Amino acid sequence: MQEQATSSIAASSLPSSSERSSSSALHHELKEGMESDDEIRRVPEMGGEATGTTSASGRDGVSAAGQAQPSAGTQRKRGRSPADKENKRLKRLLRNRVSAQQARERKKAYLIDLEARVKELETKNAELEERLSTLQNENQMLRHILKNTTAGAQEGRK
């Protein structure tokens, strides 16, 4: 009897009980697998909802209009419940842990790339040092040849 009175008050904003039972069951089955972490861990508020809406869990389909009116003002004044604070803290810790793990993975990938670049640059540096040594030896030999050639040409003029 009380459910009929409650549903007639909220009839303008909610579907009829037959629509609610058929469509909400289907809608709930579709939505149930897609609930976010917030929805799964949320403690249902007894008075924080508008008159005639279903309960926060959305599982029973019973209206919470007449049950939670007295605690509506006190719940909002007190702020978050300890369970909500704990859930929020745990969620923050989990996000932080995931973020830290991702940062460690990025750092590891960066260091691997950096080490590969170091090896590449060391190899290139060794090749360049070898080439420098070869060119210096060649330059020294050419200077010696030039010196001998110019010295021999000067003796030939005399």
From Swiss-Prot:
Composition bias type Basic and acidic residues, residue spans: 26-44
Region Disordered, residue ranges: 1-105
Domain bZIP as annotated: residue spans: 86-149
The entry's keywords: Activator, DNA-binding, Nucleus, Phytochrome signaling pathway, Transcription, Transcription regulation, Ubl conjugation
Region (Leucine-zipper): 114-142
Post-translational modification: Ubiquitinated by COP1. Ubiquitination takes place in darkness and leads to its subsequent degradation, thereby preventing to activate photomorphogenesis signals.
Keyword Transcription regulation: yes
GO biological process: positive regulation of transcription by RNA polymerase II; red or far-red light signaling pathway; red, far-red light phototransduction; regulation of photomorphogenesis; response to far red light; response to red light
Residue segments, region Basic motif: 88-108
Bias kind Low complexity: ranges: 1-25, 47-58
Compartments it resides in: Nucleus
GO molecular function: DNA binding; DNA-binding transcription factor activity, RNA polymerase II-specific
Region of interest called Interaction with COP1, as start-end residue ranges on this chain: 35-46
GO-annotated cellular components: nucleus
SMART domains hit by this protein: BRLZ
SUPFAM superfamilies xrefs: Leucine zipper domain (SSF57959)
Pfam families registered for this protein in UniProt: bZIP_1
Function: Transcription factor that promotes photomorphogenesis in the light and positively regulates fruit pigmentation and fruit nutritional quality. Probably acts downstream of the light receptor network and directly affects transcription of light-induced genes.
Similarity field: Belongs to the bZIP family.
Summary of subunit composition and partner proteins: Interacts with COP1.
Misc remark: When it is down-regulated, plants exhibit defects in light responses, including inhibited seedling photomorphogenesis, loss of thylakoid organization, and reduced carotenoid accumulation.
Protein name according to UniProt: Transcription factor HY5
Species assigned in the record: Solanum lycopersicum (Tomato)
Lineage: Eukaryota, Viridiplantae, Streptophyta, Embryophyta, Tracheophyta
